[in-house]
Amino acid sequence: MQVIAVYPGTFDPITNGHTDIVRRATRLFDRVVVAVAASPAKQPFFNLDERVGLARDALSGLGNVEVTGFSGLLAKFMREQQAQVILRGLRAVSDFEHEFQLAGMNRHLAPELETLFLTPAEEFAYVSSSLVREIAALGGDVSHFVSGPVVAALKARMG
């Protein structure tokens, strides 16, 4: 049986912490689906198509990775993908409470699914998409935190 993991998120934009999680997941699973959530309630900085494109660029060197956009219930998307594992990243203890609640809700909605938590490499443990956007908006260098295409997209959008 092929084991498929889905790594859902807004990825606004995808960071090197995200790509670190995906890279390590490719060694654990037959296929990793990076599911870029529409997340209209979060009012994303980049639209869904832009976020999918940036994620594809950042992950292009990984063979068993697919990037796709989605909206709606994650449990439904998981079934559509025939996936067994929800992959989530934990940067700090502060992330755990929210992630624990999400895992419990997903277990209730789809008991056949498992949630697996991975932590990023130490150098990315403090990186978040919102911090990257804030630093970029203030004219800071974010090239250590995101890929070249993301740096270019941030500069183009922010002027």
From Swiss-Prot:
Q: Name one GO molecular function term.
A: ATP binding
Q: What reactions does this protein catalyze?
A: (R)-4'-phosphopantetheine + ATP + H(+) = 3'-dephospho-CoA + diphosphate
Subcellular location, in the record's words? Answer: Cytoplasm
Q: Which domain of life is it from?
A: Bacteria
From the UniProt annotation, give the residues forming the signal peptide. Answer: none
Q: Which UniProt keywords apply?
A: ATP-binding, Coenzyme A biosynthesis, Cytoplasm, Magnesium, Nucleotide-binding, Nucleotidyltransferase, Transferase
- Gene3D superfamilies attached to this UniProt entry: HUPs
Q: Which residues bind substrate?
A: 10, 42, 74, 88
Under SUPFAM superfamilies, the record lists: Nucleotidylyl transferase
Give site residues, Transition state stabilizer: 18
Its cellular-component GO annotations read: cytoplasm
The EC number(s) this enzyme carries: 2.7.7.3
Primary localization class, coarse: cytoplasm
GO biological process: what's one of them? coenzyme A biosynthetic process
Name its co-factor(s): Mg(2+)
**Pathway of action:** Cofactor biosynthesis; coenzyme A biosynthesis; CoA from (R)-pantothenate: step 4/5
Residues annotated for ATP binding in this entry: 10-11, 18, 89-91, 99, 124-130
Write down the NCBIfam families for this protein, in alphabetical order: coaD_prev_kdtB, cyt_tran_rel
- Role this protein plays: Reversibly transfers an adenylyl group from ATP to 4'-phosphopantetheine, yielding dephospho-CoA (dPCoA) and pyrophosphate.
| Assembly notes | Homohexamer.
Q: Which family does it belong to?
A: Belongs to the bacterial CoaD family.
Put simply, this protein is called Phosphopantetheine adenylyltransferase
